[in-house]
Amino acid sequence: MKRTTKTIFIALLILNFFALNAYGLSYDASNHYELENVIIKQMSKYNPDFNIKYTGSLDNIEEVLKNTVDKNIYLKSNISEVHWDLSSTKHVSYINVKVNYIITQEERIEADKKIVEILTDIIEPYMNDHEKAKAVHDYIVLNGKYDENKLYYSDYDLLMEGTSVCNGYALLTYNMLSKLNIPVKLISGTGTGEAHIWNMVKLDDYWFHLDSTWDDPQPDIGTISYSYYMLTEKEITKDHTIDENQDIPKSTKKYYDYLKELSHDKLLAETGLDMYNEENTAKNESDLISILKRKILYHPLRISIRFDKSISQSSLESAMSKLAINDYISQIGYSPIVSDNTGEWNILNLYIKYKETPEKITLDFAKN
């Protein structure tokens, strides 16, 4: 479930002749700052071919041109190729920029329209930013499918085709949250050693890492994971690395702790973070069976439990088989066992399908 990035090819030709034969629109820039602004503005409009009459210094010009794209992750994520041609005389230079985007301007407009329609459907007036962010995350995970063939790269693809690599997941998360005025960033790096991209989201005063791609279980069985939902930097970097030279906000507040402070019991249960509560931590097989029996009474779509590392795989399977005897359950699946954020316990994430959808999915706030 990792992203395959498209390499940005930059061809810089410094040619010593006066005029540049070009077909795109022309803009003026007299210094590096103005040059960057022109490039960013035109790329933000998905302009595929434009010219710049540049009268500033040529010192480090190749680095300036390359870094303009590299340091703007949103632009870089929407581009497949960039070609720069530069010709110069003693006092003026002409730069032609040709760009191949992963979508067209028309597709961007269509995607934005679709995003507004979706948000109108999934966002309620009473929701706070925590609930809005979760609604966006859940929509993307439930309606998206990771593109194993690596043919689709954009949020437009994820919206219209229902599939994309991580670039599309991260872009759709970015664009949906941005329209809700929730601060959000794109973060580039690696996931288990492969090029990857995800998001950071600011909720109230705190920034968190959010990887909607890795929260979409594979194979796609119509379930939602929250294993990479609102993590600290320490938590995300267990299997992600962050590219250098990015403006990364500090992220040290554990989302579980913050939801406890806010008394958001409903969100704790819905995201499975209530597994950190004492009553949802299994010290032995008997505890595990007891917790599962209690939780299944509320017909959840997902059950998350912390359990002692001494509990064997056969004990886990035995406990899960006892759930399967309930005749209203059609399917039980679980994600790979991982350690919790303390490293001292393991986590069991169960995904449950019912033969009939309950009229109302209730949540377990009960205490033993």
Regions found by a protein language model. Give the residues of each.
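Sec-dependent N-terminal signal peptides of Gram-positive bacterial secreted proteins and lipoproteins
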Residues: 2-24
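N-terminal accessory/pre-domain segments preceding catalytic cores
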Residues: 20-127, 237-368
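Residue-level detector of well-ordered alpha-helical segments, enriched
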Residues: 91-94, 132, 136, 169
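Secondary-structure boundary elements
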Residues: 103-158
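Catalytic cysteine-centered active-site loop
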Residues: 147-153, 163, 184-194
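Periplasmic OmpA-like peptidoglycan-binding domain that tethers envelope proteins to the cell wall
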Residues: 158-167
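Hydrophobic/aromatic-rich core segments of domains that either
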Residues: 168-236
